[in-house]
Amino acid sequence: AKGIDALVVFPDAGPAMLPALRSAYEAGVVTVPYRVFPDGEAGVDYDLWVGADFFADGVSWGNWIKANFPDGAKILFLSGPAGNSQGVTEREGFESVLTDAKYEMIGEQPFEVTNWDPALSQTVLTAAIAKYPQIDVIVSDFGPSLVGALPEFQKAGRSIPAMTASDGNVLACFWEDNKDANPDFKLMTVPTGNDNVRLAVQHAVARATGGVVPTETAWSGPVFEDSTDPAKPVTCRTDLPGGLYLSAEMSGEDQAELLK
């Protein structure tokens, strides 16, 4: 309605957003959803879905859990909206590694629903802490959203458990501030994925302007931080805002400048 040429969309609600995507595409707007799969078909409902390798993230988390908990673990997994493709695929990834029954998934299945909302994440995690006397590992695909709830472990007289998650400066600094008082609080992160949208924007702009379309159609990132591996230290930048993602290609300083 406003005459835009290209639209990049994070369809966090999944298939519920498909009609809106299709409407934009049929109106001639270059339409590029990214990250969460909205269903539908490229060339029919939108131009291209730019995904991410969430299965690989899950495998990375699974390998880390297996290495650090060889005797098994009780695992609590938190993701976004119910049924979102990101959480489902991540679960498939780490379950492909954690095949032994000694690795027990607790909480709602296949994951605790948080809508990636920090307030709801805090409510969900607080309830889980009260319900489960043993939580060995928390898996979260939006790690920074849990920072407000993690102190509930200490209030209950328990160490914050090990955590595999997506990165964020606020999470890294929380770990730095609390690791000494919480002996079980190991942390491994994968990139939160700011560069996933970078690739989606590159596709949208190229297609709308007749430019060179990128050859990559999906984004993936390696393990970013691992408190058990000196080669991948947890990186807290107290001189920068907490809401930054140091795994991104854009520097923390440039991100901070954009947020002013």
Question: Language-model segments: what does each one mean?
Answer:
Residues 1-260:
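A residue-level marker of the well-folded mature domains of exported/periplasmic proteins
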